[in-house]
Amino acid sequence: MSDPIKLHDLRPAPGAKKAKTRVGRGEASKGKTAGRGTKGTKARKQVSAAFEGGQMPLHMRLPKLKGFKNPAKVTYQVVNVSDLEKAFSNGGDVTVADIVAAGLARKNQPVKVLGNGEISVKLNVTANKFSGSAKQKIEAAGGTVTEAK
């Protein structure tokens, strides 16, 4: 019985690993043109990936982007009056923190209340913004509206 094979004794079979040809390193081994043929752009330098053989390239065919992104834009978390009625059916005071705790909006972002749906519960709502119809519906139900800064 022979010795067991050890990991450090493993070698590739003879001829299994062929050394890569180093081109352009002397006349004997693919020197001079190094497999690029003779003359022409591709023999002299690398052609850029954007070059399309003289056709108008894609990045020049497409239109430029116009306009800009307003850095002062405020994106509000939207909550409807009907959502407030479902979440706070007992009535009372409702703040932005309460709306976030109820899972109606994300925290650390301003909240705007919109007037979609109906409300019959008396709520004293404090939020960052209100639509006109939301104000009317909340006040018609006997509640109050306060805009927080």
Swiss-Prot record:
Residues 1-11 have a biased composition (Basic and acidic residues). One of its GO terms (molecular function) is structural constituent of ribosome. It comes from the Bacteria. PROSITE patterns: RIBOSOMAL_L15 (PS00475). Gene3D superfamilies: 3.100.10.10. Pfam families: Ribosomal_L27A. The keyword Zinc-finger does not apply. The keyword rRNA-binding applies. Residues 1-44 are annotated as: Disordered. GO terms for biological process: translation. GO terms for cellular component: cytosolic large ribosomal subunit. Keywords: Ribonucleoprotein, Ribosomal protein, RNA-binding, rRNA-binding. Binds to the 23S rRNA. Part of the 50S ribosomal subunit. PANTHER family: 50S RIBOSOMAL PROTEIN L15 (PTHR12934), LARGE RIBOSOMAL SUBUNIT PROTEIN UL15M (PTHR12934:SF11). Belongs to the universal ribosomal protein uL15 family. This is Large ribosomal subunit protein uL15. It comes from Corynebacterium jeikeium (strain K411). The lineage of its organism: Bacteria, Bacillati, Actinomycetota, Actinomycetes, Mycobacteriales.
